[in-house]
Amino acid sequence: MTEHPEQQYLDAMARAWYGGDERVDRTGVGTKSLFGVTMRFDLSDGTVPLITTKKIFWKSAIKELIWFLSGDTNIRPLVMQNVHIWTDWPLDKYRKATGEAIDRDAFERRIVDDPAFAAEWGDLGPVYGKQWVDWPRYTPAGDGLFRREEKGVNQIAELVGMLRANPSSRRLIFTGWNVPELPGMALPPCHMTYQYHVAGGRLSGILYQRSCDLGLGFPFNIFEAAVLIRMLAQQADLEPGELVWMGADTHVYSNHGHLVEEQLSRSPRPFPRLSLARKPADMFSYALDDFVIEGYDPHPHIKAEVAV
């Protein structure tokens, strides 16, 4: 019998938790870490790797992906859609800067109700989406100086163009790792570099992550990477192939023991199928209703705290 592809994830989680290197990390929580983990997921049958050993809020993941592709870096559009995955970083910054003991719900209400407050405290800096669709572009201005252009490089649009015009290229890449702009980011990109490969009319992709939180981040990361392949394939008139995932520092947080134990006690269920309801004009015109998930029957959700 063929092993369920989700077992790769469960095995990595077990290896990290029971035998990983115990590390004191930036957050102060501590992790148990592996280095250099690879997983492969077949997308050619229409399924997507949406983790089943706990419920994943896949609509929130789609909303985040659409937000990335919009180039926005402020949490307000996410919070207005009841997506809270990025709130903790600006909330932590606000608390430290003001000393105000505000809870997350109150902070999010102010983000939604007060656009000026959101502009000041809800922005994450030049994170993922900014780099994906508006990577800074500079042109010579004379005397050895350079001028930053108003409109940057849209890596996603250029990628689609290359997939259509030169699908055998080895430069089918986009990245969020912009070294000079890292200090201004609330969190440097974890899922940082994506590369694509076309063979036999099928589009495959590799996602490289410098850092991966197996408990909370990984399920969103692989699902969104798989959805991206489906979107890119649709835009370039290709079929989906395979998702290869590569994690450098692949870890479980020390306060996620209950999550690990519970997930490892559960058996994976069949991955669901993803269909796209329409073909939008471009990568930036997709909406939540365009994504149809069928056959998702996960185990119950497991709550765990995010490390900031």
Curated annotation (Swiss-Prot):
Catalytic activity of the protein: dUMP + (6R)-5,10-methylene-5,6,7,8-tetrahydrofolate = 7,8-dihydrofolate + dTMP
Pathway(s) served: Pyrimidine metabolism; dTTP biosynthesis
Compartment(s) of residence: Cytoplasm
Enzyme Commission (EC) number: 2.1.1.45
Binding site for dUMP: R26, R170, R171, R210, S211, C212, D213, N221, H251, V252, Y253
Database matches in InterPro entries: Thymidate_synth/dCMP_Mease (IPR045097), Thymidate_synth/dCMP_Mease_dom (IPR023451), Thymidate_synth/dCMP_Mease_sf (IPR036926), Thymidylate_synthase (IPR000398), Thymidylate_synthase_AS (IPR020940)
Protein name (record): Thymidylate synthase
